């Protein structure tokens, strides 16, 4: 499902108490702008246009294509962030069901879901500058942990997301956008902490659990 298809409803109504429709439209416009920049960079470097994840991997270790990496990586981050939210038309209770399966691992890693929330809010709020905060899982250690990446970088290139960089170190399960454009419209310059707190209430734990279960299947 494309970014446009997934968020057609959100463009009209926003994300409940998390993001207004105006904020969603601004993020959507920025996403489209990035797609235009990706196409431009592909022409400059005579690179066949592919999905952002492929372009990100291809350009990650090439300084001459740093712009292509940044633009495509940010698109990957956008998609992962929004796909982890409860859709506007879906009851929140349905999206909480996945938390049941995650609870034993979360409790072992953080103490409780409440402590995970507290750490994500505090760590995310303390990030200086633009970036992303990730919940990741280590199949080797059977532990969940937090990871901060800055600017357009992401957790996929640290872990199992793409074969070229496969290390089995970590698997991204969830992320929150910490760039100012994500929260400035609705929360203001000093509203990042409230933005992250509201985001927590919009997490689709069923999606997160599906990502987690996929790592367990791969390890068999």
Swiss-Prot record:
Signal peptide positions (record): none
One biological-process term from Gene Ontology?
A: mitochondrial translation
Mind listing the GO molecular function terms for this protein? metal ion binding; structural constituent of ribosome; superoxide dismutase activity
Ribosomal protein in keyword set: yes
The alphabetized UniProt keywords are: Mitochondrion, Ribonucleoprotein, Ribosomal protein
Q: What is its main location?
A: mitochondrion
Name of protein? Small ribosomal subunit protein mS42
- The organism encoding this protein is Schizosaccharomyces pombe (strain 972 / ATCC 24843) (Fission yeast)
